[in-house]
A protein has these predicted regions:
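Radical SAM/AdoMet-radical enzyme domain recognition
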Residues: 1-66, 72-76
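Auxiliary Fe-S-binding modules of radical SAM enzymes
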Residues: 64, 68, 78-237
Length: 237
């Protein structure tokens, strides 16, 4: 184990507990992050999924908290994982027909450009300067689809994953293996390829064939607004 990713959607205890449905304090997570850094795991990535009206007030507190930590803070646009619709529209559209409003609505998504502008405005007011793009060669290991920025003179890095407002399908290098043994070539598609039985048999050639088949069937572009049947907790992320 060389690096880890931690989901952290708020520093405020009330928001944290409500969003994660847990009975422990956010301080436990923060201590775990510090311990991971102390034992040499690097990079330590912090993923924050931003939902308008729920935790978007936590954007600046998290940016300030991790600014000098050396951790990689990544803001992720809120996405319709675990619901279905028939439209194939891919961009953020507040006028698009809503999915189940208890699960996802287009107006819940805060686009990365808005996130960055809000961070810059808050940073400027605090005299911290503005985010600057990070050279691709300086991006953290396992950077994947995120686009990275940093504050001048700060140890931390800020990334934005913009699946809704500016999809990155052409550069996607991800496959996912679900807990029940299926290879999923695209997070936003329900297409899956079962590798479980081949793994149980120890059939390495069959496993390799299935993985190659999954790679070959990665879609050219996601249809994210269609939603998916599985939730993230079922897919793994």
């Amino acid at each position: 184990l060389q690096r880890i990713t931690v989901s952290l959607d708020a520093l405020d205890d009330v928001i944290f507990r409500r969003m994660n449905d847990v009975d422990f304090a956010v301080g436990d997570v923060l201590r775990g992050i510090e311990m991971a850094q102390q034992v040499g795991l690097a990079p330590v990535k912090i993923n924050m999924v931003v939902k308008r009206g729920t935790n978007d007030g936590e954007i600046l507190p998290l940016a300030r908290y991790f600014r000098h930590s050396g951790a990689v803070l990544r803001f992720i646009e809120y996405m319709p994982i675990g619901d279905e619709r028939t439209s194939s529209h891919c961009a953020v559209d507040p006028h698009a027909p809503a999915l189940n409003p208890e699960l996802w609505d287009a107006s819940d998504t805060v686009p990365s450009d808005e996130l960055r502008a809000r961070i810059n405005a808050g940073a400027a007011a605090a005299g911290l300067g503005e985010l600057e793009p990070l050279d691709i060669n300086d991006a953290p290991a396992g950077a994947g689809p995120a686009r990275y920025w940093h504050f001048p003179g700060a140890a931390g890095t800020v990334g934005f994953i913009s699946a809704m407002s500016n999809h990155f399908c052409a550069n996607c290098n991800r496959l996912r293996l679900t807990a029940d043994g299926n290879v999923r070539p695209c997070l936003f598609s329900d297409a899956e390829y079962s590798v479980r039985e081949a793994l149980r048999r120890g059939d390495d050639m069959q496993v390799l064939s299935i993985w190659r088949d999954a790679v070959a069937h990665k879609p050219q572009e996601h249809a994210i607004i269609e939603g998916t049947q599985r939730f993230m907790s079922q897919i793994g992320g």
